[in-house]
Amino acid sequence: DHASFVATCAAITDYMEDRPLGSKLLQIYDRQFALISATVMTYNIVGHQREPDYLQYLVEELADSKFPHDIPNTFEFAQIQVEKLSQMIAKVKKGMKTMTNLGHMEILDSGASGAVNFVMGLSGKDVGVAYKERIDHGIYAVSVRGSKNCKVHLGKIVNLLATSLGGSGGGHDKACGAVVPKPKIKKFITELNKKIK
């Protein structure tokens, strides 16, 4: 029974609450309750993504039919993550660049996925791209998001483009990612801009 709640949170987090199954799941729960629960869980997962023991603990708590507000310190940790994101807004405003069809920015001090929605929203474009160099691997980790007005399947485009440049990638129509060799990042962004008319 609790699995439907976890699935509802996942649908919200993965931008799928408007899809038939996601929409049906969301009708089961109070919308605001589901939204805040999904948000708190997302911030806890993303903020602890390099801590497998904590992630396992979250899974066990959810499997025991606990809601995020029942799990100690989840709201407090989410508040810390929100503060970090609010600081990101000023950095994006200062460092973001725009092209005809997208906004993009290299991220230096946090993860790309945390900034990409701000890049999209603040650029006024239907697509946002944030990328962070992984110096030890000679690649860029790229995060791509599309607005509801984005008319192309970004996951398919990113998959083909990243692969053609010696990397890999893909994902959903409005949310995806890629790994791109460092020397090819500018070409990746330029070509992506051309393909999302």
Can you say where each PLM-predicted feature lies in the sequence?
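A structured phosphate/pyrophosphate-recognition subdomain
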Residues: 1-104, 108, 120-127, 131-134
